[in-house]
Design a protein with these regions (language model features):
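Tandem CBS (Cystathionine beta-synthase) repeat/Bateman regulatory domains
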Residues: 1-159
């Protein structure tokens, strides 16, 4: 494949149509498990086949940032708990029941399958996102990632 061939490729040629998705009713815990098991950093949120949003590690990290561990004081090898552990436990339990729909980003940058790879790469760079859902009329068709685009360039050393 030469450089001209890459420029002619469309998002639909390289998108991953089998990328894992989440439903808005699933929990944050479900999302974390999916990310870990699938080695991904984000997933489209789909409701009745339509793209409803996207949830990323950043959404989950910022959500959990509100929960602060009370901490410990270590004095001469002895540990003294600080703060209110009951309050911490209650906040952690509340977080465990939070749904993906509550933390997802609803305004999603998307491309269509006929979009150029340059268009997808521009969205990724300007909006600082790693995953761009590929959609047609709100119907999710797949995703294209930074790695998909970078891999094409690495596998095509002729520039």
């Amino acid at each position: 494949m030469n450089q001209q061939d890459i420029r002619e490729l469309r998002v639909g040629d390289v998108m991953q149509s089998d990328w894992p998705t989440l439903g808005p009713e699933q929990t944050v815990e479900d999302a974390i498990k999916l990310f870990a098991e699938s080695a991904i950093s984000g997933a489209p949120v789909v409701e009745d086949g339509r793209l409803a949003g996207i949830v990323t590690e950043g959404d989950l990290i910022f959500r959990d940032a509100d929960i602060k561990s009370p901490g410990f004081l270590d004095i001469l090898g002895g540990v003294i708990p600080l703060g209110n552990w009951d309050e911490y436990r209650q906040e952690a339990l509340k977080s465990a029941g939070v749904t993906v729909g509550e933390v997802m980003t609803r305004e999603v940058f998307t491309v269509g399958p006929d979009a150029s790879l340059a268009e997808a790469a521009t969205i990724m760079a300007e909006e600082r996102v790693k995953i761009v859902p590929v959609a047609e009329d709100e119907w999710l068709r797949g995703v294209v990632t930074r790695m998909d685009i970078l891999t094409l360039h690495v596998l095509n050393p002729r520039r």
